[in-house]
């Protein structure tokens, strides 16, 4: 049984840590904020609240501080009436182009199983089974390398201006802000783009690594990029707001500039230290460094690491000091 990402039964301390962050958070919002649908997932809930609208950044911030989000989104689409409950009533005005790359699709994830806090290699367990998926620096770097290839495709083959964002967990989003004919692409048009990226078919072979488009990429050993096709195909998809927190890991959704990215605890914006009580025993790879935990033992950790561990189901935070 995989650990739920819900915070039901989790300490309220994380809620307060998130709220403190949002008091001064800088959110990267579109200029046409009034045309976007907003959505969020509250703490202690597995469902989303959708069809929200805001006319200004200040109005959104006030809402966030009263309704602290575990996850926060806006729509890739623009609407005449974004608050309408039914999609056909919203009045679609076009959408940005989205791509999603996730570690699950690109790396072999190391899934470790625990029974009553101790790691097990067999299927036998008389107690609760917990599964922990460890993400390594090498894995995230591989996903990022794929994101850079996709960025190059969008620039060189389509003449677009893509932006890469770290998802705040274990992947990357690429967004192209569209305000022209690209915004009006329907699902089938977007599917063709996704297929061009995932399963390219050059008209002939070439040994020239500097050749145009997929001819050169094939010569360099690049045979396609694995993306979540459904994200690209759906013009009414929700996308994480840059500057918000990903409630699966407590890391910040950030734009990648200068094509440089490092996967470490500094992706977390939290300050101070926490008293963390582990539910598991063992050595773990956490945000690029190894950590030793013992079940039931309270350990002093940085808030950056402690919040990540708590959200991933390793244990609970007992206290936080800024």
From Swiss-Prot:
Biological function: Catalytic subunit of DNA primase, an RNA polymerase that catalyzes the synthesis of short RNA molecules used as primers for DNA polymerase during DNA replication. The small subunit contains the primase catalytic core and has DNA synthesis activity on its own. Binding to the large subunit stabilizes and modulates the activity, increasing the rate of DNA synthesis while decreasing the length of the DNA fragments, and conferring RNA synthesis capability. The DNA polymerase activity may enable DNA primase to also catalyze primer extension after primer synthesis. May also play a role in DNA repair.
GO biological-process terms attached to the record: DNA replication, synthesis of primer
PANTHER family hit by this protein: DNA PRIMASE SMALL SUBUNIT
Gene Ontology cellular component list: DNA-directed RNA polymerase complex; primosome complex
Coiled coil start-end: none
Documented EC number(s): 2.7.7.-
Pfam families for the chain: PriS_C
Assembly and binders: Heterodimer of a small subunit (PriS) and a large subunit (PriL).
Keyword Nucleotidyltransferase applies: yes
Family: Belongs to the eukaryotic-type primase small subunit family.
Gene: priS
InterPro entries per UniProt: DNA_primase_ssu_euk/arc, DNA_primase_ssu_PriS
Catalytic center residues: 100, 102, 228
Keywords: DNA replication, DNA-directed RNA polymerase, Magnesium, Manganese, Metal-binding, Nucleotidyltransferase, Primosome, Transcription, Transferase
Keyword Membrane: no
Names of the cofactor(s): Mg(2+); Mn(2+)
Protein name per its UniProtKB record: DNA primase small subunit PriS
Recorded GO MF terms: DNA-directed RNA polymerase activity; metal ion binding
